[in-house]
């Protein structure tokens, strides 16, 4: 089985994965998956606190998967080598914790899932490069091209889509405050052409079912 949730921000919002709040995990095993839709935050500085929470996740009755958001330390993340899993590329961060690389269609628990991490930080002017902000938060042209190639190979049909930010038209329904950028425009193109059952995303610190096709997640943990 697969569950998805929103940003964990290291240990700040990880409490939603406790057995008290996420009771379904008692019936799960390491063959089941919990996927975080970006801003995982537990590959940041290698501190003792970070290692504690990685160990805590490893001890859960599920395997943790995550896509990157805009608040990740990409310098450290990209030091982890890519390895083959789910028919694509992942980074093994710790036992039973895997980062899902951008722009892939993966087969997880028999479901075809398109994953595309990344988002634009709208408070960049208050952040410091390589300390609290990384240029790699936004996918490169190469990563977007890889995503298109992956979708081409799958005839533009998947079961689910997991991203950190939303397509432009969906984002605009959440708030007028959010600006257009190359990634939300790219995702808008994908939205128009892709056949999918449902699209889940994080980033906006909100739990809301937008419509029959889109759900934004933050604290909720839901099964797909």
Where do the PLM segments sit?
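Conserved beta-sheet core of the metallophosphoesterase superfamily
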Residues: 63-67, 89-95, 166-224
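Short, charged N-terminal beta->alpha structural module
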Residues: 1-18, 120-131
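Catalytic metal-binding/acid-base residues of hydrolase active sites
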Residues: 9-11, 40-41, 70-73, 119-120, ...
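Core catalytic region of metal-dependent phosphoesterases/phosphodiesterases
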Residues: 5, 11-108, 176, 183-187, ...
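Active-site-proximal loop/helix segment associated with metal-binding centers of metalloenzymes
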Residues: 88, 95, 109-177
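Structural motif
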Residues: 4, 33-37, 160-164, 200
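Beta-strand-turn-beta hairpins that frame and shape the catalytic cleft
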Residues: 1-3, 104-115, 160, 211-215
